[in-house]
A protein has these predicted regions:
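Glycan-recognition and catalytic cores of secretory/periplasmic carbohydrate-active enzymes
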Residues: 1-183
Length: 183
């Protein structure tokens, strides 16, 4: 589960008058995040993969692999290079399967609806530049270890998402990219 996945609750989704209210969405998000008791089972929040989280785990496994290669004694506690490389391949494939579809290049979003401000809702899987950066960087790190060309190609294609799908706002002598294609 994720601290912000409360809007995936099947109970919440079954109540349209609640899910259409910006205030109710904020209350649910903050309630799930701050409640000392995990309400997710009771509220029927499914366990799902979060692409940004998988990207961070993939980066972590790449770091472990590099540490073991640099200091083979670490293999006793961290795993052999082969076992770590196998896990890197698994996580990279999972990450690739979690891409948001319909954009100019590889991109990733969160597996839940989330609200950035009181009146701005991002539907689940809306790609963001932040999640996409973590995921593309992790795939490049995986490529460095595995030499699986597809990992590099997919990672590099994220630049097409940034260049073609994100909005630009003029700022001083340049511009700023939006956080997502919706802004």
């Amino acid at each position: 589960w994720d601290p912000y996945d409360g809007l995936n609750s099947k109970v919440f989704q079954a109540l349209p008058f609640l899910k259409k209210s910006a205030i109710c969405r904020l209350v649910v998000i903050q309630g799930f995040k701050r409640c000392p008791v995990n309400l997710r089972r009771l509220a029927l929040v499914p366990k799902e993969y979060n692409a940004k989280g998988i990207g961070l785990f993939l980066s972590g496994y790449c770091n472990l692999y590099n540490a073991v290669k640099a200091n083979p004694k670490l293999a006793e506690s961290l795993g052999s290079p082969d076992s770590l490389k196998s896990r890197i391949n698994e996580l990279a494939e999972l990450l690739i399967s979690l891409q948001s579809k319909g954009y100019s290049g590889a991109c990733w979003g969160y597996n839940f609806d989330w609200q950035a401000r009181r009146l701005f809702l991002f539907p689940k899987f809306t790609p963001t530049v932040v999640a996409s950066n973590f995921c593309a960087t992790a795939l490049m790190e995986a490529y460095e270890i595995t030499r699986e060309k597809r990992f590099l190609e997919i990672a590099l294609s994220a630049a097409h998402f940034v260049i073609n799908d994100l909005h630009r706002t003029e700022y001083k002598d340049g511009f700023l990219f939006s956080y997502s294609p919706l802004q």
